[in-house]
Each structure stands twice: as C-alpha cells, then as structure tokens.
Amino acid sequence: LAGGLWDGLFGVVGPEPHRFSAAASALFSVAARLYAGRKAWRTACERVAAKLARARKDAVDPTRRRLARSLPEELPMPPSTAVIGYISAANGMGEAARGTIVALSAAQCPVHFVDIDPEPTLKAVDLLPALPELRKTAINLLHVNAVNVTRCYEQMGASFFRGKHNIGFWFWEMPTLPRRWYGAFSLFDEIWVASRYTQAAIAAVAPVPVVCMRPLVQPAAAGSATRKDFGIPDDRFVFLFCFDALSILERKNPQGTIAAFRRAFGAPLKGPLLVVKVNNSDRVPGHERSLGMPDDYMADLTASLAAVNGVLLDQRYDRSTVSALIAACDCYVSLHRCEGFGLTMAEAMYFGKPCIATGYSGNLDFMTPANSYLVGYRLTELERDWGPYEAGDHWAEPDIDHAAELMQAVYADLSLAAARGLTAASDIAQNYGIQAVGSAMRSRLQLLALKKEGFGAALPNRL
C-alpha cells in the first residue's frame, strides 16, 4: 500500500509497537558495540543482533503485515463527498469549508457542496467555488459546529443523511464540550477537528471516532492595497491584531493586546504602532447585551487604543485586502484566552510574519519556540457564562508583562524576528499546504472506502 495511506492510518491510531521498537533498537546498538570490541563475543552477538532485529521488525510491523495479507493491492478511489456548510460566508467557518473543498479537489477526490445561506451581512457569493452540481454522494462532510447541527439537519432533511457516512467538522475553543450538545453526536459516524486541543476536548465525551484533520491555510494573494490605503505610515513598525467582534470579545481579548503594547512602548508617536482590525463592530451592542456585557465595550476598546495612539480599522474588507493588511504589518499579535485553531495567526505566519501569541490551545499545533514568540499564561476559571462558554470551565490568562517583553524583543532584534518569520512560513507551507492537507483527507476517505468494501476486520479497531 502507498506510504501516504500508512502515514494517515498510523497518524490516527498511534500504534504502541513503535515504543517497543525503540527499546529493541537500543539493545541492538549495545550488541553492535560488543561485536566491534570483543572478537570472542562475535558469534554470540551476531545471533543476538539477528534476533533483536527480527523482534524489532515484529514489534513495529504486526499490523502492517496483517493488513498486507488482507487488503487489496490497489487502493479504492475516495468516495464522492458532499461538503455542507456556510460556504459563501465571509468568516472563519466559511473559510474553513472552502479550504476543505479546495484541498479535496486538489487531491482528486470527487467533491460537491451544499451552501447553507449565512446571514445576509456575511454572504459573499463571489467566494463560492466552481464545482459541479451536487450528485449522489457516499459521504456527507458537515462543516457546521455542534450548536448548529440541529438546524442544518432540519434544513437538509433526514433523507439527505440516511445511508451515508456522515462526518462533522467541528471547531471548539474550550477544553470541555457543553453537555447540551451531546445529542449532536447521534447524526455522525465520526468527527473531524482542526487541532489536537479540540480533539482532546471532544474525544473525552464522543461516542464516535474523533480525527484531527489539519485545515488548509492558504489565504488569498495580497491585493493592491498599501499602508497608505489603511492610514498606516510607511515609517512605523506595525503590530497587528485582527478579530471578529461576534467571536466573544472576552475570549479574543483585544484589551490584553492593547495593555501589553502600552506596557512595552507607552503611547509612541514614532516607531512601534498598534493596529487593530475588527469585523462586525456595528453589531456588537446587541450581541453584548445578549451576553450580559456592558453596551460600551467597543467604546472602551476604541478609547484604549486611542490612548496608545493606535489605529482602529473597523470596516469589512474582501479576502485579498485582508491579506494585503497582513502583508503590510511587521508582527502579528494575539493574546487570546483560547482558540480552537487560530486561523489569523496561521495566515500571518503563512506570509512570513513573526507572531506573538498566547502559548495555549489550538495554535500550539503550528506555533513553536522556533517559529514564533509564545506568551506565558495561567489557567483561570470562568466565573460566569460567556456565550457558549460555561462557568466553571477554564481558559488562559496571558501574562501581559511577558507579552510586553516579547514585543520589545521583536522590535529590538529585527533579524531574529525575520528569521522566525521565515521558519514560520516554511512550517505552515509544509504542514498546512494544499498537498499535505489534501493528502491527509484523501487517505482518510480511502480508509473509509476500505471499511465499506468489507475490509473493516483488517483495520485497527480505533479507526
């Protein structure tokens, strides 16, 4: 079988024999040294080495040998897949769904889509991918979160899901999944998630397999917009933070970013400049009231940013303009309290920008001390509900002093910051590029096809 399928298989089940094989390798090494140093032991060591080599191979490969005896020589074609979600939405959920479609198409997987109309203010028809109309499919990949599953099910109808292998692609930011959403599992045969952090949260309560499937990170090419178009001087060093005001302001924590910048640089008129980009600021008052937040949260945020002589960008941009904004900055900052994945950070790294971020939650799948600047934190308990996030759960409180020190470090050593940015771009391209993501999705769908064709007994139980 192809190496890619094996990698996908063992990436899911995590075979324990690899740990035993490491021990065998160590013993083999000892035997080899004895062989080289003591001729009297030559024959005995040859026998020991041969036995250990066989033991190592048997420890690593029992599943592979069993599969090789049982599985067909050629892999089946990936089954036809329908991606259902807010495909035309100009937000993170829409971006994730479109990325899945692009990755599947690039991996030569038959794919179609069903666009669930988002709210009118979020709809951007020009974002719809060009694909054939929906035909009969074997797999439904529902790109909506647990909270919206029931509404989607009612909209599509029970017959749409009957007889299919139904997969949910969920994004979730907290370490615990609310009990009120457990019923959503009943529709699905498995759940895909974008990070190991979310995988741990959902797998703890899921009655079906939970597979970590990396999302595609491929932002639009930067448009023609320049710093001048954004009202940003050319001679300033720009720290940028972007967020959606409807994504729970307390979680995104823009005030934390402003506080860290103020501690690092005060209110400079030259040199460092903080730019904050926000979506849906006009809808915040009603949203805040629904969460029991004060109506003046955005007003306070605006005042805090003005106090450090920062720039607030509160209009909606198309994808190429957002990419141009990221490309125009010098460093990206996110002092979030938790993230299911952290798309804006990944996109900034895609463009080679040094990134400062809370060292907690989903972004740790792609951020390391070698490619970014991770901020220390302490876990704090939520004393009240914040939207879907329940009192008693935990999220991170980033260390503002440490964040300020890292901002100063980036500004003081531009060569080191640039080097980390280059490493970041390479890491994102290698692990979240279209080839890596498409190959992983294709491998998973091929495994599902093998199970459907009656080879389930030859596959590990945890698949």
Predicted regions and their residues:
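Extended catalytic core of nucleotide-activated donor transferases of GT-like folds
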Residues: 64-72, 82-84, 102, 112-201, ...
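Conserved donor-binding/catalytic core segment of Leloir-type glycosyltransferases
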Residues: 82, 233-252, 258-262, 274-276
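Nucleotide-activated donor-binding/catalytic signature segment of Leloir-type glycosyltransferases, i.e.
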Residues: 281-282, 286-323
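A short hydrophobic beta-strand element within the catalytic core of glycosyltransferases
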Residues: 332-333
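Aromatic "clamp/platform" in nucleotide-sugar-dependent glycosyltransferases that forms part
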Residues: 337
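Short hydrophobic beta-strand element within catalytic cores of glycosyltransferases
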Residues: 354-357, 367, 371-376
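C-terminal "capping" alpha-helix adjacent to the active site of nucleotide-linked donor transferases
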Residues: 378-416
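A short, well-ordered alpha-helix in the C-terminal region of glycosyltransferases
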Residues: 402, 409, 416-430, 447
